[in-house]
A protein has these predicted regions:
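Conserved, structured C-terminal
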Residues: 1-247
Length: 247
């Protein structure tokens, strides 16, 4: 990706840090380039000025330059964004989700004096959590699970139970087969008491992915990201420094 972007906008893009921005020109079209993405890989996004006028002109230039780099026009690999612990709006989280229920607690600052939308509610939620009384019963976790390789988008949320024959206690939101880890990985919602890595659960997969149709597969809660990202986002960087929660 870097070599292609150098061809398009010049060597300056090589020095662009994660989440950095660079003004450039592609085929006469003004753009902003960012080193961001939806997969944990080292990738770039191009923002085009006056896109309704110049989209095809810029896009065709990208395709032409990409021929020398075996460029393929595809969406980010779903399993890579799951492996990176990147959440999908509407699939993993929604307007009712608190950052503290997911891996987004680092986005809620402790020392910010300025007002922002939701500040009072978020600070109250954090105080309750630190007092041992979280204002929620479910949290999002990473899971490694058995079954046949999951190779398509889940059309529904698959249920999670504590025992193979038990009642559902949670559900999977984003599952996929990870070729790097050689196992199915997923993100899902489970009761707070099962959030720690090593917790053993069961996932009720559809027949095409179950080892035995009608029977659940074993799963274990794991830390996220599932593997270190080539281009870690701010959440992953702070977590490695022991700052998973904001200061």
């Amino acid at each position: 990706s870097q070599a292609l972007m150098v061809d398009l906008v010049g060597e300056a893009v090589s020095e662009l840090p994660s989440y950095g921005l660079l003004a450039g020109v592609i085929n006469g079209c003004d753009v902003i380039v960012s080193q961001t993405g939806f997969s944990g890989e080292k990738g770039y996004e191009i923002y085009l000025y006056d896109a309704t006028l110049h989209a095809e002109k810029m896009w065709n230039a990208v395709l032409e330059a990409g021929k020398a780099h075996q460029l393929m026009v595809v969406a980010p690999a779903h399993h890579r964004r799951i492996a990176a612990g990147i959440l999908s709006w509407g699939q993993d989280i929604d307007v009712e989700t608190l950052p503290f229920q997911t891996n987004l607690a680092y986005q809620v600052p402790r020392a910010k004096e300025a007002h922002y939308i939701g500040k009072q509610a978020l600070e109250a939620a954090r105080e309750a959590i630190e007092a041992g009384n979280p204002p929620f019963s479910m949290v999002m976790v990473g899971l490694k699970l058995g079954g046949q390789p999951i190779t398509d988008y889940a059309p529904d949320f698959w249920l999670i139970s504590k025992t193979s024959a038990g009642e559902p206690v949670g559900y999977v939101t984003s599952p996929w087969w990870s070729p790097e880890l050689e196992t199915n990985i997923a993100m899902g919602w489970v009761p707070v008491q099962y959030k720690e890595p090593g917790a053993e659960l069961w996932v009720h997969l559809p027949a095409e992915y179950a080892d035995i149709p009608g029977s659940p597969v074993a799963a274990v809660v794991v830390d996220t990201p599932f593997r270190e990202s080539v281009n870690p986002n701010q959440r992953e960087i702070l977590k490695k420094k022991g700052l998973a929660a904001a200061v």
